[in-house]
UniProtKB/Swiss-Prot annotation:
Function comment: Putative transcriptional regulator.
One GO BP annotation of this record: DNA-templated transcription initiation
Family the entry assigns: Belongs to the Tfx family.
UniProt entry keywords in alphabetical sequence: DNA-binding, Transcription, Transcription regulation
Name this protein carries in UniProt: Putative transcriptional regulatory protein TK2151
GO MF annotation: an example: DNA-binding transcription factor activity
Superkingdom as given in the UniProt entry: Archaea
Species this chain originates from: Thermococcus kodakarensis (strain ATCC BAA-918 / JCM 12380 / KOD1)
A Pfam family of this chain: TFX_C
Length: 151
């Protein structure tokens, strides 16, 4: 199977998952603890990039998304989502309370306010998701660059 991880990185992660210390892994692999540390750190960085890439892909293919700006009260977000859903003819299978509960658990908020900009979106499987990547609206791109066929 194709992977972003090297065989050594996979082996290090497997051994760490079994509870081994970096020094123990180094002994097993015949390398230094510092090298094991580097392998593990780079593997985890690759995994984080892969997760972010998948989230971005899901966001691009989402049914609906709304931007939430830093300082915005999250109690206003469900109404924004429902309004945009109505405009696009999309059914949101969540209540206001469920959306707020989701935001409290998953979004960068503090005391009802967004700590930074983020996007709330409904993916193709009707799951709510939060992304800190703000994508330009393609309709807006078309307006700024002379038309819809200019991408």
């Amino acid at each position: 199977m194709k992977s972003f991880l090297t065989e050594q990185q996979i082996r290090v992660l497997q051994l760490r998952a079994k509870g081994l210390k970096q020094s123990e892994i180094a002994e097993i692999l015949g390398t230094s603890r510092a090298n094991v540390s580097i392998l593990e750190r780079r593997a985890l960085e690759k995994i984080e990039k892969a997760r972010n890439t998948l989230l971005l892909w899901e966001q691009i293919n989402s049914k609906i998304s709304v931007e939430v700006k830093k300082g915005e009260d999250i109690f206003q977000v469900p109404e924004k989502l429902f309004k945009k859903a109505d405009e696009l003819g999309v059914k949101v299978p969540y209540s206001t309370a469920e959306i707020i509960a989701f935001l409290v658990e998953h979004a960068p908020i503090d005391d009802r306010l967004a700590k930074r900009d983020f996007t709330l979106f409904l993916d193709r499987e009707d799951r709510l998701r939060v992304s800190e990547c703000i994508l330009e609206d393609f309709d807006e791109i078309g307006k700024h660059e002379g038309g819809k066929d200019t991408i």
